[in-house]
Design a protein with these regions (language model features):
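Structured core elements
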Residues: 26, 57-62, 109, 120-123, ...
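C-terminal beta-sandwich/jelly-roll accessory domains of carbohydrate-active enzymes
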Residues: 126-175
Length: 175
């Protein structure tokens, strides 16, 4: 959190086109408790401009070779199914595909874990909710992949309900 109340939601939709142009950077995602009032009632307005699921997606959209879990352990214990993503996500990538992007508004990135047939897709947006279009044409043909989708819940809102999320599983192919 910054002393002035945190970054605006579009901040992380700008960084991939500025600081990340030269390669990986130091960034600290993984904040599940975004409201400062949770820790200090004298700061009722301070909060990070993000949702819990956006924090997960940042592990993919903001590559950093030294990732960490940036929140308090108690907050991860409150959301163990979401924390599982942080435990599982790769930190080193062999391939990256930018599937859709508009600087400052949204970005969707697919990355292949180095030395593995594991793929991760991260999609983030600014303060305006949107549905990402994810073509799986980057996947090798003739294979099926089990997908775990971490998505903002229907009632998620970065200001009012940042911890609403859904997790679902399915099968995808390159088609």
């Amino acid at each position: 959190f910054e002393s002035m109340g945190g970054n605006d939601p579009d901040h992380t939709c700008i960084l991939p086109f500025t600081r990340l142009k030269g390669g990986p950077m130091d960034y600290t995602p993984g904040i599940f408790q975004t409201k400062l009032s949770y820790y200090n009632s004298s700061k009722p307005k301070g909060q990070a401009g993000t949702t819990l699921v956006k924090q997960l997606a940042l592990y993919v959209t903001m590559p950093s070779p030294l990732q960490m879990a940036a929140d308090l352990p108690d907050n991860y214990r409150r959301f163990p199914d979401a924390f599982q993503f942080i435990k599982d996500v790769a930190v080193d990538w062999s391939n990256s595909w930018y599937l859709e992007a508009e600087p400052g508004d949204y970005i969707t990135v697919a990355r292949q874990a180095k030395g593995k047939q594991e793929w991760y897709v991260g999609a983030i947006t600014d303060e305006h909710p949107r549905t990402a279009t994810i073509p799986f044409s980057f996947l090798p043909e003739g294979r099926k992949y089990i997908v775990t989708v971490y998505a903002d819940g229907r009632d998620a809102d970065w200001k009012d309900n940042p911890q609403s999320y859904d997790i679902r599983r399915g099968i995808v192919t390159s088609k």
